[in-house]
Amino acid sequence: MRIGVVGDPDVVVGFRLAGLTDVYEVKSPEQAAKAIEELNNNSEIGLIITTERIGEQIRDSISGVKKIVVEVPDKNGPIVRENDPVKVLVRNAVGVDIK
C-alpha cells in the first residue's frame, strides 16, 4: 500500500522530503479534484492525505473516494468548525461533550 498526497506547495514539500512519491502539488480546486480522482483510480494507493482547506473545497469529489482520506491542517493551522464531526461522534457514542 502506498500513500498519495494532494496539497499546496508548502504542504507537499514535507511529504516529498519524507520520501513519498505520489505527491500532487495543486493550485486550484479543479486540479485537486483531478489529483484525488487519479489517486483513487490507482490500485496501489491505500491512503490519500490532503489539507483541510482543499477538503472543504472539493468535498463532493472526496465523498466518492473508496480509499481512506485524511485531512491535515495546512500552514495556517486547523480550521475551527462549529460542529466538529469527531466531537459529534464521541458525544453520540459516549454521551460526553468534549471541550
From Swiss-Prot:
Gene3D superfamilies: ATPase, V1 complex, subunit F. It is a peripheral membrane protein. It is found in: Cell membrane. It comes from the Archaea. Keywords: ATP synthesis, Cell membrane, Hydrogen ion transport, Ion transport, Membrane, Transport. InterPro entries: ATPase_V1-cplx_f_g_su, ATPase_V1-cplx_fsu_bac/arc, ATPase_V1_fsu_sf. One of its GO terms (molecular function) is ATP binding. Its main location: membrane. Transmembrane segments: none annotated. Belongs to the V-ATPase F subunit family. Component of the A-type ATP synthase that produces ATP from ADP in the presence of a proton gradient across the membrane. NCBIfam families: PRK03957.1 (NF003047). This is A-type ATP synthase subunit F.
